[in-house]
């Protein structure tokens, strides 16, 4: 078979011309064609939002396949597993289309082979690849192939804490313990523990792990800044230049201010005013000192310049003219503060070096000890696996050359989110001229994962300036958004983003351009809107915005009712007037927390709202916290916090007044007693203030105490699972949370708590005390458990974080809480790290001598060392740049219309920013000083001509947000004609049938529980195990007498129908009879269907195309075909188990539908034909059964890795659910 060669540049140019003049409705852009067909060199594709980068990657891969490059000879890295699966699906679809289009048998066979190879090709995350590499070559480092990944943060934290504690004790007992103690106190301050120091150690460790060689970075880079910045001459030139530039700009701003007509330069007598003379002196000095800095001061006298400036300028930042404040001195004052105490800093800085050396030593020792502990467990973090892979590729030249010769091309998606560790790995896999990198620096928003956008930026500049090093291709056409969204985005970022703040200059190389004529059609009603809730309130003489500023200062940044009402009003208008489906609307928020008001208000207005779910907030959900405090109280009633929380909860609803009355019931004056003891005193009327306990309160306490004691007694003889459900049922708590705004999620959380308690007791750990201890350990390490996933209604408004929305698109987008301050906590951290400069710390200095405070034993003061200040400046710019990119990602999600919503005082915000600009950008100092999205937008709107901005700003008052203004949702009846079609009986008969059907369904659903024998021998299965074992596909060998629990319903003239169970049984048999080969055909399925023992009416109900799609469209189906020689079906098993309570043995027997026996793992699968609502429901129903199957196979074959899957066949299409 002959393959076509790759296109040269002239052929690519001709193809671009042909495409341009062609008649296709959707044409590829010249840049897309160039990115698809260019070959033989490194390529960086800068793909703006919505520019079709995934399309380009798929087309490029397919083109290479058609030119004879096997898909197994490409390394294709994606950012997420989901992205990898989507890419595989697209490739498979294109290959299938290719098979149908060609008549060449050889080409058909080749493309079919390529389709089969997708499952085995290196298409996935870098983590997946490094695990594969380590499985093959880990022996070179002494790593056994059966290692596991420590994905649970709680497990990581527990092991880290154990290593830290041991190492800490060793250092405290060492001969350098005094230096170490000073180091710990430097970070712990007045705290009586070392938690603050431990946090900094973990922070350094985490940061170092993102480098290609953590130990090397700690040894060579960690102390670079500390060693470098020891004197005035060591100060970075850019720091001095920033001060001098600020002096010049301050002089210009002050001159412009004095030239205002309302300034008043002269008195009535015609003489200059004192203020004018003073300001002229400042202007002259600022210009003179900045111009002659080297001759007047120089670096060695920078501290004196700062003192002179402090004497020259006012201490405040504003100049008031005609009642208007102008922040003329704001920027220069912030710059001066860095140098004012420079001499003092340089005096004390040498004292930090011994502490930093000790810190360096401790972190290196911790890193090594932690790695050794993980090796002993044969369990590693993802970063460990990558470092091992890098070490193997660096040290083993033969292995490195195998990979470099194997891969025709090394492709990576989302390149802007790479860290230096990943970049090193890609370089090792590449031969130096076969890299293909796709990304967009404007969408780099994962700095918290140590992603470094400068990796992308350096490549961008290098290829732009040196084309011989690689080709730069720009994809600027946006195929997602209408012009109104594109224009607003360009307007914002052309004035906001440059290399100084934002990492790149947002110029013609990065402007978004509409990719189709349809997008260029103008819809003025869809212009971008910034809607700000006006917080100006004159009631009580207090400004609501001032109170809001206070709340923000305290970190309580929640959505206000006004903002939510603006949102609701517009959503109702869109839905009612423009018939916009709720599912076309998405709300973007900065974090998952503090959004309860959204759900509450939407619930009030009958607007369906679903969340993206999120992760690791489970233990902090209110309903779970209530239950955990209940369990803590049962375990130990003397736990005051838990007991009061339980009493205050909806289960017992004691109010604050009642709790205060109980708190006064000490048995003796001056005696300290627990709250539960005071409860008992209240019940026995033995308290000091018994008269405060009313009869109503006494009755309420009696009910509480009875319930608590009943639960305590029950907990001693029953499982945790049973105890939790007893609490739910006794106090109707499960039903109560069903009335909350997030009822479905809340009930799922409570249900999951019972399941997790059940799973916990299957381990070697048992009992309430240990369960509570485990939960508290997780919370103490500031970790959590994953949230429970729910099937979400399709027709609902979506709310998700901006990070979660990346890569997605929505018709209408609302960006909420735009006035929320950026998180700057890292900038005020005791320690700041830089990859290039190393560490900078705040130093706890004793300035007693400096202040001549001889009468005091010591005067401790935190000083920001020079390395700290330099790193702080770098970190602040990096944080602001990432916030700009976050706003870019949020704005570019919208297809039709974009809204941004915030709040603030119209009076204060309308004239907050002056009209000063730097070319087409807001002044750098202004951009650095702004701390929220809203102020960036306001500043742009006030500085630049609003006609050219493509977005409007409107303040909305309470008068516009009344109930009548907001409106309401009108609902249509949910009753469909089809529901009434066969209703030919009287209402009474219909009701009777419904009742009998319901009874029968309940009998069938709870058949196992009803049929439990009332009298059992010790050898029979204990009740505790019944919910686990007595499930579909698992038979318990125990004699039991049983009474039938089903009865036949009278037919009431119903026509005979094929039951779903008959269809399910036939479908199940069909799947077992299909002959599995490397390629299951439709003919194979037809032949198998003829062997099924079922009536023709039943077989007519089976969709054979659904069965075929399982083998063609699902990864599991393809895997079964690829490994058909390792497939086992209808495999019986028997397993002996011991009941831990009675020590009696019992046998479990069952039949496994099928499994693949591979060298390193077993892939177990089971067909389920039940009707179901959500895959999660089926997973919860059958996960225990699958766990038993897995345990049996694990013991039989001595293979620890078992992947379990349910093949759900109860709907129109087959779904695969992992149960591992």
Swiss-Prot record:
Domain (UvrD-like helicase ATP-binding) ranges: 26-482
Cofactor: Mg(2+)
Record domain UvrD-like helicase C-terminal: where: 519-807
Reactions listed under catalytic activity: Couples ATP hydrolysis with the unwinding of duplex DNA by translocating in the 3'-5' direction; ATP + H2O = ADP + phosphate + H(+)
UniProt key word Phosphoprotein: no
GO terms for biological process, alphabetical: double-strand break repair via homologous recombination
InterPro entries, per the entry: AddA, DNA_helicase_UvrD-like_C, DNA_helicase_UvrD/REP, P-loop_NTPase, PDDEXK-like_dom_sf, PDDEXK_AddAB-type, Restrct_endonuc-II-like, UvrD-like_ATP-bd
Entry similarity comment: Belongs to the helicase family. AddA subfamily.
Protein's UniProt name: ATP-dependent helicase/nuclease subunit A
Organismal lineage: Bacteria, Bacillati, Bacillota, Bacilli, Lactobacillales
Designated gene of the protein: addA
């Amino acid at each position: 078979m002959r393959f076509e060669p790759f296109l040269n540049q002239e052929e690519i140019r001709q193809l671009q011309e042909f495409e341009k003049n062609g008649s296709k409705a959707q044409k590829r852009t010249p840049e897309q064609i160039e990115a698809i067909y260019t070959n033989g060199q490194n390529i960086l594709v800068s793909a703006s939002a919505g520019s079709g980068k995934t399309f380009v990657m798929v087309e490029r891969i397919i083109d290479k396949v058609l030119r004879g490059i096997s898909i197994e000879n490409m390394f294709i890295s994606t950012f997420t597993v989901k992205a990898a699966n989507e890419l595989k699906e697209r490739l498979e679809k294109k290959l299938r289309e290719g098979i149908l289009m060609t008549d060449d048998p050889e080409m058909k066979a080749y493309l079919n082979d390529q389709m089969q190879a997708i499952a085995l090709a290196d298409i996935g995350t870098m983590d997946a690849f490094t695990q594969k590499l380590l499985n093959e070559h880990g022996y070179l480092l002494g790593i056994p192939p059966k290692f596991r990944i420590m994905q649970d943060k709680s497990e990581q934290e527990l092991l880290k804490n154990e290593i830290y504690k041991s190492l800490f004790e060793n250092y405290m007992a060492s001969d350098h313990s005094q230096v170490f103690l000073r180091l710990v106190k430097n970070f712990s301050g007045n705290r009586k523990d070392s938690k603050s120091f431990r946090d900094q150690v973990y922070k350094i460790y985490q940061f170092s792990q993102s480098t290609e060689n953590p130990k090397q970075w700690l040894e060579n880079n960690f102390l670079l800044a500390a060693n470098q910045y020891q004197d005035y001459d060591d100060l970075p030139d850019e720091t001095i230049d920033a001060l001098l530039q600020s002096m010049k700009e301050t002089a210009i701003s002050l001159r412009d201010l004095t030239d205002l007509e309302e300034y008043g330069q002269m008195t009535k007598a015609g003489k200059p005013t004192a203020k004018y003379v003073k300001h002229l002196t400042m202007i002259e000095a600022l210009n003179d000192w900045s111009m002659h800095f080297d001759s007047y001061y120089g670096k060695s006298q920078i501290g004196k310049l700062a003192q002179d400036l402090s004497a020259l300028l006012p201490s405040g930042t504003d100049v008031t003219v005609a009642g208007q404040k102008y922040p003329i001195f704001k920027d220069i004052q912030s710059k001066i503060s860095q140098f004012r105490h420079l001499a003092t800093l340089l005096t004390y800085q040498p004292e930090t070096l011994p502490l930093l050396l000790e810190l360096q030593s401790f972190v290196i020792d911790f890193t090594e000890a932690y790695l050794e502990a993980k090796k002993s467990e044969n369990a590693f973090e993802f970063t460990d696996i990558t470092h091992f892979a890098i070490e193997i590729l660096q040290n083993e030249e033969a292995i490195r050359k195998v990979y470099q010769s194997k891969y025709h091309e090394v492709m990576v998606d989302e390149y802007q989110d790479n860290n230096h560790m990943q970049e090193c790995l890609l370089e090792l896999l590449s031969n130096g001229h076969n890299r293909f990198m796709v990304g967009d620096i404007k969408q780099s928003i994962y700095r918290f994962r140590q992603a470094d956008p400068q990796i992308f930026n350096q490549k961008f500049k290098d290829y732009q300036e040196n084309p011989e090093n690689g080709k730069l291709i720009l994809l600027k056409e946006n195929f997602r958004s209408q012009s109104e969204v594109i224009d607003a985005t360009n307007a914002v970022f052309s004035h906001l983003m440059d290399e100084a703040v934002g990492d790149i200059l947002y110029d013609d190389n990065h402007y978004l351009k509409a990719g189709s004529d349809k997008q260029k059609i103008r819809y003025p009603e869809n212009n971008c809107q910034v809607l700000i809730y006006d917080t100006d309130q004159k009631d009580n003489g207090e400004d609501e915005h001032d109170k809001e500023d206070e709340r923000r200062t305290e970190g309580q940044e929640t959505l206000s009712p006004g903002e939510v009402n603006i949102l609701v009003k517009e959503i109702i208008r869109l839905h009612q007037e423009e018939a916009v489906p709720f599912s076309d609307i998405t709300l973007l928020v900065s974090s998952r927390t503090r959004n309860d008001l959204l759900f509450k208000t939407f619930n009030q207005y009958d607007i369906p709202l679903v969340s993206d779910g999120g992760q690791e907030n489970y233990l902090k959900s209110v309903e779970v916290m209530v239950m955990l405090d209940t369990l803590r109280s049962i375990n130990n009633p003397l736990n005051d916090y838990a007991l009061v929380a339980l009493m205050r909860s909806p289960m017992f609803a004691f109010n604050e007044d009642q709790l205060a009355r109980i708190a006064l019931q000490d048995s003796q004056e001056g005696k300290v007693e627990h709250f539960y003891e005071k409860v008992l005193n209240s019940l026995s009327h033995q308290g000091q203030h018994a008269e405060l306990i009313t009869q109503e309160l006494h009755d309420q306490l009696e009910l509480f105490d009875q319930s608590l004691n009943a639960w305590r007694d029950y907990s001693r003889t029953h499982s945790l699972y049973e105890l939790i459900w007893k609490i739910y049922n006794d106090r109707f708590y499960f039903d109560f949370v069903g009335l909350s705004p997030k009822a479905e999620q809340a009930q799922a959380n409570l249900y999951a708590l019972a399941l997790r308690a059940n799973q916990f007791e299957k381990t070697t750990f048992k009992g309430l005390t240990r369960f509570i201890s485990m939960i508290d350990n997780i919370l103490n390490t500031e970790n959590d458990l994953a949230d429970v996933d729910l099937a979400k209604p399709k027709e609902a408004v979506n709310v998700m974080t901006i990070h979660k929305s990346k890569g997605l698109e929505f018709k209408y987008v609302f960006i909420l809480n735009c006035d929320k301050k950026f998180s700057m906590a890292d900038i005020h951290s005791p320690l700041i790290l830089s990859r290039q400069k190393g560490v900078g710390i705040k130093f706890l200095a004793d300035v007693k001598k400096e202040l001549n405070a001889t009468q005091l034993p010591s005067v401790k003061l935190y000083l920001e060392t020079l390395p700290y200040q330099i790193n702080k400046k770098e970190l602040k710019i990096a944080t602001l740049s990432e916030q700009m990119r976050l706003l870019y990602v949020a704005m570019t999600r919208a297809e039709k219309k974009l809204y941004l919503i915030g709040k603030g005082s119209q009076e204060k915000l309308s004239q907050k920013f002056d009209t000063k600009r730097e070319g087409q950008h807001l002044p750098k100092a202004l951009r650095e000083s702004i701390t929220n999205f809203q102020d960036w937008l306001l500043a742009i709107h006030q500085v630049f001509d609003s006609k050219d901005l493509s977005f409007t700003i409107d303040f909305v008052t309470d008068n516009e947000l009344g109930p009548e203004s907001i409106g309401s949702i009108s609902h249509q009846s949910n009753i469909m004609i089809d529901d009434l079609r066969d209703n030919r009986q009287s209402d009474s008969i219909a009701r009777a049938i419904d009742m009998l059907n319901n009874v029968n369904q309940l009998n069938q659903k709870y058949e196992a529980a009803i049929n439990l024998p009332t009298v059992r021998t010790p050898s029979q299965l204990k009740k505790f195990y019944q919910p686990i074992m007595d499930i579909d596909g698992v038979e318990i060998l125990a004699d039991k007498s049983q009474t039938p629990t089903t009865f036949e319903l009278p037919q009431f003239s119903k026509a005979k129908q094929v039951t779903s169970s008959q269809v399910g049984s036939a479908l199940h048999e069909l799947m077992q009879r299909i002959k599995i080969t490397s390629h299951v055909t439709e003919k194979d399925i037809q032949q198998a269907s003829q062997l099924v023992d079922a009536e023709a009416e039943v077989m007519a109900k089976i969709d054979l195309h659904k069965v075929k799609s399982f083998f063609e469209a699902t990864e599991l189906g393809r895997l079964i075909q690829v490994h058909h020689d390792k497939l086992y079906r209808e495999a019986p098993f028997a397993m002996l188990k011991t009941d831990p309570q009675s020590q009696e043995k019992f046998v479990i027997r069952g039949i496994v539908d099928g499994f693949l026996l591979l060298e390193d793992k077993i892939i177990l699968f089971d067909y389920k034909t039940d009707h179901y609502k959500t895959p999660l429901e089926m997973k919860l129903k059958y996960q225990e059964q699958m766990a038993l199957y897995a345990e049996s196979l694990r013991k039989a074959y001595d293979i620890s890795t078992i992947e379990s899957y349910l093949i759900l066949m109860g709907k129109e299409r087959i779904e695969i659910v992992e149960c591992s």
